[in-house]
Structure formats: structure tokens, C-alpha cells
Design a protein with these regions (language model features):
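Enriched for short, Lys/Arg-rich terminal
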Residues: 1-24, 57-61, 66-89
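A short, surface-exposed loop/turn module that caps and links secondary-structure elements
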Residues: 31-56
Length: 89
């Protein structure tokens, strides 16, 4: 069963700013999250103040998201370079 992927306004803005080649990789990552948002080699649950979120690695970029299992939805909050993403969160 697939999940719907929804971008926050911040994540949508970050997505628009990406270079075309990175956009393709990120889009492939978002497609993976539709089918398997909670398990996989590039997926990890975050700790500390972000304990309700998960992250998916896409090269040097990170997709930080929350999962609503009853609604079958993935809410992408942040989509940024790894050096910036945890500062923004």
C-alpha cells in the first residue's frame, strides 16, 4: 500500500531551488518514500528534539519527514543539504 507524500511550504521552496540533477535524485527518493517510508538502508529515525521525524539520505541532501500511518501520509518538513538541514530543524 502506498503513502501520499506531501511537502511543507519550506520543503517545496527548497525543492524548487535544487539543481536539475539533484532534483531527479530527490524525486527518486520521494518515490521510494511512497512505498517504504519506515525501512530501508538510507532511512533512519532521528533522535533528540527531532525524535518524531525520520530522514532519508539522497547523496549530500537529507529529506526529513514525519509519517502518519493511519492516514498513509508522509509529511516532508525539510529538504536541504546535510550541513544545513539539522540547523534549520
Amino acid at each position: 500500500m502506498t503513502y501520499s507524500v506531501r511537502l511543507s511550504p519550506r520543503a517545496a521552496r527548497d525543492y524548487k531551488k535544487l539543481e536539475a540533477s539533484i532534483k531527479l535524485e530527490v524525486q527518486a527518493g520521494l518515490d521510494v518514500l511512497q512505498d517504504h517510508p519506515l525501512s530501508g538502508p538510507k532511512i533512519k529515525r532521528l533522535k533528540g528534539r527531532l525524535h518524531d521525524y525520520w530522514r532519508y539520505r539522497v547523496g549530500d541532501y537529507r529529506i526529513v519527514y514525519a509519517v502518519d500511518q493511519p492516514a498513509r501520509a508522509v509529511y516532508v518538513e525539510y529538504l536541504q543539504h546535510r550541513k544545513d538541514v539539522y540547523r534549520a530543524a
